[in-house]
Amino acid sequence: MTTSFREAVNGLDEASFQALYGRWDPLTPEQISDLLAGCGARWIVAGGRAARVGAPPRDHADIDISIRVADVGLIRAVMRDWHLWEVDDGALKPLLPGVALTPDCEELWVRHDAGQPWRFEFLLDRYSTDDEWVYKRDPRVRLPWQRAVHTVGAVEYLRPELALLFKAKNDRPKDRADLLAARLDRSGRAWLADTLDQLGHDEWARLTRSGETSESDGAATEAAAGATELID
């Protein structure tokens, strides 16, 4: 059976991935806060770090920062001394000064230059509005911003239940590990379970409601949980 490019990339272990695409050494949320201070764009920590707030930590090979696509210009202005690379289904292309963003681009990787590691990535939100966070895979799923984010220290994070919703599609070992480790309040757990049901993720809905785990889930692979992914 022929393996698709997407499957091949997502199947790489962390060492193989970084050997192919370059080394990662992610900044902390606090360092990113210093970097983006005063840029005028709202940015939010997403991904596995958002899913794990309040839970036992794991190693994270990267860090995801969500911004609205309308704010890319503000980001480019404050990061003019950095290199931004568009991600397109496994391919990386530099976003050069003065060149417009590719219309369907959803991710940007960030580093100083080719001799330096990748430091973080921007997830480009094309669906949320000034008033509401909107789930990109089904715009029926939406929440007021005050319900979608919370502040940890001085940094905004996507709430864990929203970060976990994004992870249900791929259900990789690290995604399952994040679900099983998550610390959700009662309303967040109920919202996530109901939304997973609505979107057809029955097993994740069951695990969210019950907190059950099989023996194989419990052995779940915290070791595999830190791998970087290029394709969502």
Where are the language model's segments positioned?
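Compositionally biased terminal segments of proteins
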Residues: 1-232
